[in-house]
């Protein structure tokens, strides 16, 4: 199957308070035991995709550090163009996504499907055949950790998201932290709202399902490894 062309936005303006003091840098630039930087390891999840534009929304105080590894981000992702956006911390991942998406609007390939990718998880994101009228897709792995987001699925093939919730176990399908918006017009419409009753990407997707009647697919990712908490980092590679 031919690789799908995609754009990628990595929102990285969180404070990373759970990891503070482990290493003298921000969370995305921390090193894993194998030497990979967090966000570079996460980008390796996209090896089955043809990345066109990569947008990294980063903390202003660490702009120089990110700039020093910008070429590596391009090499790892295979992106045709990489854009670094320094910014002050925001109140939520959705606000950070909006900053990245506004930059994407200046790109010639803005209408391509767009991944929103967390910086603290790795997994092999599979290729898939989109369903009719599919607006997006969520990738998941088997887990029961209450600190994750979870989906409940439906459909003949159990591959349609019926519900997505944050930090509440409603199934054994934990969200990997990779969200694909295939309908860019829908994403733009969602981000044009000025306020939300939620701040997580999962809430944005649930809103799309409930209010826009959007069809969101679900696919299992392989070899998922999380490293966003101290406990997960200690278990990395074991």
Give, region by region, the residue ranges found by the protein language model:
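A conserved hydrophobic helix/loop-capping motif in glycosyltransferases and polysaccharide synthases
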Residues: 8-14, 29-32
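Conserved core of the sugar-phosphate nucleotidyltransferase
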Residues: 122-198
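Conserved alpha/beta core of the MobA/IspD/sugar-nucleotide pyrophosphorylase nucleotidyltransferase superfamily
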Residues: 4-6, 172-238
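Conserved N-terminal catalytic core of the sugar/cofactor nucleotidyltransferase
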Residues: 1-10, 18, 36-114
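Active-site acidic Asp-centered loop
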Residues: 116-118
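Active-site glycine-centered loops adjacent to acidic/histidine catalytic or metal-binding residues
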Residues: 14, 120, 229
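Short acidic/His/Gly/Ser-rich catalytic and metal-binding motifs that mark active-site loops
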Residues: 15-22
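Short catalytic helix/loop segments, enriched in acidic residues and glycine
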Residues: 24-42
